[in-house]
Amino acid sequence: MSPERFAVKLRALRKRRKMTQATLAKKAGVSRAYLSRLEMGLHDPPLSRLRKLAKALRVAVAELLS
């Protein structure tokens, strides 16, 4: 999946959960700035971060990547 498509998916899942970037970042153990860059499609996160984001969003990693 391209970083741009991942960005759209991540933002949509975060908003569906009614979470701010700051809230999701804290739950996932990443900085808000890093999360912002992910949502802009500027980074391609490693699997370890995908797992943390998925857990914080209460979804499977596969859903983040679909």
Model-derived features with residue positions:
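A detector for short, charged/polar N-terminal pre-domain segments
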Residues: 1-5
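Conserved amphipathic alpha-helical interaction elements at protein-protein interfaces in regulatory
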Residues: 12, 16, 44, 56-59
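Short, conserved catalytic or interaction motifs in soluble domains
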Residues: 40, 59, 66
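Short basic helix-loop element that most often maps to the first helix and adjoining turn
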Residues: 8-27, 52
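Recognition helix of helix-turn-helix/homeodomain-like DNA-binding domains
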Residues: 30-44
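Short alpha-helical elements of helix-turn-helix
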Residues: 6-8, 32, 47-50
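DNA major-groove recognition helix of helix-turn-helix/homeodomain DNA-binding modules
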Residues: 29, 48-63
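Conserved hydrophobic/aromatic packing and binding residues within compact polymer-binding modules
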Residues: 10, 24-25, 35-38, 64
